[in-house]
From Swiss-Prot:
It comes from Homo sapiens (Human). This is Eukaryotic translation initiation factor 3 subunit C-like protein. Pfam families: eIF-3c_N, PCI. Phosphorylated. Phosphorylation is enhanced upon serum stimulation. The modification Phosphoserine is found at S9, S11, S13, S15, S16, S18, S39, S166, S178, S181, S182, S910. InterPro entries: EIF3C, EIF3C_N_dom, PCI_dom, WH-like_DNA-bd_sf, WH_DNA-bd_sf.
Amino acid sequence: MSRFFTTGSDSESESSLSGEELVTKPVGGNYGKQPLLLSEDEEDTKRVVRSAKDKRFEELTNLIRTIRNAMKIRDVTKCLEEFELLGKAYGKAKSIVDKEGVPRFYIRILADLEDYLNELWEDKEGKKKMNKNNAKALSTLRQKIRKYNRDFESHITSYKQNPEQSADEDAEKNEEDSEGSSDEDEDEDGVSAATFLKKKSEAPSGESRKFLKKMDDEDEDSEDSEDDEDWDTGSTSSDSDSEEEEGKQTALASRFLKKAPTTDEDKKAAEKKREDKAKKKHDRKSKRLDEEEEEDNEGGEWERVRGGVPLVKEKPKMFAKGTEITHAVVIKKLNEILQARGKKGTDRAAQIELLQLLVQIAAENNLGEGVIVKIKFNIIASLYDYNPNLATYMKPEMWGKCLDCINELMDILFANPNIFVGENILEESENLHNADQPLRVRGCILTLVERMDEEFTKIMQNTDPHSQEYVEHLKDEAQVCAIIERVQRYLEEKGTTEEVCRIYLLRILHTYYKFDYKAHQRQLTPPEGSSKSEQDQAENEGEDSAVLMERLCKYIYAKDRTDRIRTCAILCHIYHHALHSRWYQARDLMLMSHLQDNIQHADPPVQILYNRTMVQLGICAFRQGLTKDAHNALLDIQSSGRAKELLGQGLLLRSLQERNQEQEKVERRRQVPFHLHINLELLECVYLVSAMLLEIPYMAAHESDARRRMISKQFHHQLRVGERQPLLGPPESMREHVVAASKAMKMGDWKTCHSFIINEKMNGKVWDLFPEADKVRTMLVRKIQEESLRTYLFTYSSVYDSISMETLSDMFELDLPTVHSIISKMIINEELMASLDQPTQTVVMHRTEPTAQQNLALQLAEKLGSLVENNERVFDHKQGTYGGYFRDQKDGYRKNEGYMRRGGYRQQQSQTAY
């Protein structure tokens, strides 16, 4: 080093081990200026030359760490900002990546971020609670990450197939590349074993916990030692504090010189330090392996697992070793477990597991069925409480456990008739182990089954109805019905009347909407035509659904003391009658129950059931050809325009002022599952066709009547919509088919009307959905012919003097007695002014109706009369007001003076002039 910078000493300081030259403080009198003072950090730091790879990768890891922190706090906006910066940083490191390959930690963050965004996207409840910025950022970032990950699709796929290998490779690579890395980085990119166990499962056993603790301690020691080594290599001036103090006296220029080993001794010292560091690292690894081998020899065989693979959990110890398992001990442990139920932070899955283990212990120690039944009750209740949110449905595995547990409980109750369960039994009066007396357990099996039915409904409500998953869940209904039937048999023997009514209602609710195809087939096939084997099979199948519904409902009618259960039973009974085309029984039961008078006071689920029943009643009447009854039954539902909502099959779009989020959640819980839905297009088609068959003849009969009423406003609305269209093409939708058929019927063209109502498109949309589709189509053709005949006679009666009934029969393809009957009814009801000539079989028109010209003259006269009446009324009104005003002013002129006198005089003058 040049001696230009040294003023107070001619020799170099040999006390420094690193070989750094120390110079004394310059004499102050030479320049008269103080040297530049540096902070301690600047004094102690050393300029280190780093490779471009380290710089770029460190920039990427810092951004990844920020993204992971934002993911933890659900800050999607921050994730979006950092992801954009991450993409730019990766672009800068592209040249290095091309040489070295895509780093694993970069692939990991891309895969984790995409999974995280998909999880947020599927969480509908969480999305609703997001603020506007986060929701917008979520949508934007989800699109960007999906587009960005296409370039890394193969890397991400290989990472997801074996994430453990990726973690191991990264760990080894980090150890080789950067020996000064801390455990904090590992926690950011991966999850340590201890952290994983804390997150995923309960604490491990004692030996494994000790083993993991040693590993963590070694990591901490290695971290400290590596930091110390880095400190040693960073300070090349001295090893002692005194030498550091002396080093502070170096000249200003020497502080900014880049330190590098210039002599052979310096190079040898640096190499020796590197060798010492590698040796220490090797010693640490060997020491760790030796300790692992000792643990293997002492505590059995240990298996090294890769990061991310969950350890096999050992069964928790319920009782201390050597404890005598008695009834009191088990009940005490049960109460301890139940005390944590419902508390914040309680692991519900672990609680269920503990209860199941307690059942096994009770069974192994032969503590009796009473204790097992009590624990089973609590297991089922814990399964129901697994989801604290009412809107959340049970997971499939929990649902399966629930069904199995209820079946096991019913097996025990049927196998042990001496066990009595009931919610009126106090815990103090329970008898769980005294076999000399009947066993008494507090609990209600009916409540558990009712809750099971509610959970099944929630599962069906929250499953996509068009997926295979819905079909799989629907198969569970057979198990649900079997459990309800078993509980029904049990309660018929040991339950109260109220409990029997409740379980009967559950059985009815799972039966009323199902069409009994076997019973229907037996009705179509007479007993004489069926073989003996078929008759025996029919007898073995048990009672028909009609007989079952009759028996269950009659019991409720007679025994039930609550109006709600009886009302639901009546509505289900009517629905079942209507579904099986027993129109008169369904109608009579509805009229005798008088439900339509006070149904508005019922709760919403019962009102939905009433609406469903009325709709099914109207469809039943339509199948029987009773179009007027069908129209009246469907009028209230269809005229409101809210059929979907009234039937509990969905919500209509409304403004937020009409429904808040809480109301929307409540209404969604009231929706019926998809397999109970009534086809809304079929419902509307039945209503419009019924309205067409009623409205078109009525319009033809009262064509000249300006004050005629409308039977169906919705049907007239559809007609007006069809008339407003400037260009009419072939009908496509169901409504267009009905409108086109109505126009054809208005002209008396029944064949065209028939072709619009019954064709392949309408068959696929509507008519094939009926159980007896051919019968319905035959009925429709007959009704179209009859109503077209009536419309033809109303429209063209003024044209004919007489018309032969045979001609009408041939024209509308009806037999002569039917034509005779229709015309006779029209004459009797004074709808058609004509008479029948029996010898000639002709209809003689009386021409009492005015002609078209006379109708126009009558309409003109009526309008002129109304115009005159209006003019006279207006004139009288004006005269009365003016006269009263004049008299008041005249009176004021007589009695008052001044201004009022002058005003009255002026008005009197104007009146005289007028």
